[in-house]
Regions:
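Extended repeat-based interaction scaffolds and adjacent low-complexity, acidic/S/T/P-biased segments
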Residues: 1-249
């Protein structure tokens, strides 16, 4: 107990809770009951992790993804095991993060999503908050991309709730120069990794409509005939011969 109470690392406490919950499930299956020390230690670890949440606002870029994933896990623990954990204390800590304008962007997006999922923010207000945050970050694409990553860890469905969000994301990307775009690309890719194939398809349709292009052209899935392939190969061969003639290659 003293070791758990003295632990000051958020990630370690979240991993401990996960291990204790796994152990509790195994005991329940094997013995039909759970040793009382397990929920006691889990509560101590949860309490310690919740106390640390407001301090996560200064999380570094190197730590933010791991911290946010553990924060998502802690949220899951709080909702799935309400008889064990103080859900209100957790949500209160989340609100403290949102009330601090200097919070880490990814963590802020995640906490905003948690508050929405718990019904503490109406969908219209939630979408307005997202759009406003992204609009204010158009000149800081890295910050916007990090925010999107945190947001989509829990509330990716909001992308389909209000077309303004997709439009602002598009403006953030369009505003970035090539070097900046390559910098934010890993975050943008990661943000969409949790989307289901059907959601990706739906998103593709929305983007195609927004840019007024066909979905096939957008995704690169245009059907090409054998004749067109043969003609392209012929032209490629001619181009290669011309380059040799001109001693360019």
């Amino acid at each position: 107990r003293l070791v758990v109470e003295s632990e000051g690392n958020f990630t370690s406490l979240c991993k401990l809770i996960n291990s204790l919950l796994y152990l509790a499930n195994m005991q329940q299956l094997m013995d039909g009951e759970i040793h009382p020390v397990i929920p006691e230690l889990a509560r101590l670890a949860f309490k310690g992790a919740v106390v640390l949440i407001p301090l996560l606002k200064s999380t570094t870029e190197e730590e933010e993804q791991e911290i946010c994933e553990q924060m998502r896990n802690l949220y899951s623990f709080a909702m799935d095991e309400k008889q064990w954990f103080d859900t209100e204390a957790f949500l209160s800590a989340v609100e403290k993060v949102l009330n601090d304008s200097f919070s880490n962007s990814r963590l802020f997006g995640l906490c905003l999503a948690i508050q929405y999922k718990e019904g503490r923010t109406e969908q219209t207000a939630f979408c307005q908050q997202i759009a406003a945050y992204l609009e204010s970050s158009i000149t800081h694409p890295e910050q916007a991309a990090s925010f999107i990553c945190g947001l989509f860890l829990i509330a990716r469905d909001v992308l389909f709730a209000d077309p303004r969000i997709l439009e602002v994301i598009d403006r953030v990307i369009a505003n970035a120069d090539q070097e900046t775009f390559l910098t934010i690309l890993p975050n943008l890719r990661y943000a969409f990794t949790g989307f289901l194939p059907a959601e990706i398809s739906r998103l593709g349709q929305q983007v195609a409509e927004y840019h007024q292009v066909s979905e096939a052209r957008l995704t690169g899935s245009i059907t090409v005939s054998q004749q067109e392939i043969a003609e392209a190969m012929r032209l490629d061969t001619l181009a290669a011969e011309a380059l040799k003639t001109w001693r360019i290659v």
